[in-house]
């Protein structure tokens, strides 16, 4: 199974990069996990939020693996449990899907990008910092994969 996470933004605190790397390492042979940062568009000086999101959309679309099952993180998305996320991964794996999760920038994502997604998901009803979202998503993906492989990491 191939899982890609694209996140708009760079220059995260070291603890964020270390936590994402730690969970990414844990996937081992159970899943191929890739994380890629997308350069954010600078705001101000004639670039408003709409223009910025449009520029970021272009970069995101270029980075999505061809034919990938696209999942965008959005506050209006469904919030699955860890077990439900595992069931989604199981289905995608059985269908031979390469799954790509997208974490938008500070202003979110364009409606067009959201419409292209085959699923909208949220991690929480709370507003979370982007660095925390990277860590939480990677941990939950690792947890879901561990559930599918009956690894003792997840306990009910």
UniProtKB/Swiss-Prot annotation:
Signal peptide: none
Protein localization: Cytoplasm
Organism lineage: Bacteria, Pseudomonadati, Pseudomonadota, Betaproteobacteria, Neisseriales
Name the UniProt record assigns to this protein: Ribosomal RNA large subunit methyltransferase H
Binding locations of S-adenosyl-L-methionine: 73, 104, 123-128
Enzyme Commission number: 2.1.1.177
InterPro entries referenced in this protein's UniProt entry, alphabetically: Alpha/beta_knot_MTases (IPR029028), RlmH-like (IPR003742), tRNA_m1G_MTases_N (IPR029026)
Gene: rlmH
GO molecular function: rRNA (pseudouridine-N3-)-methyltransferase activity
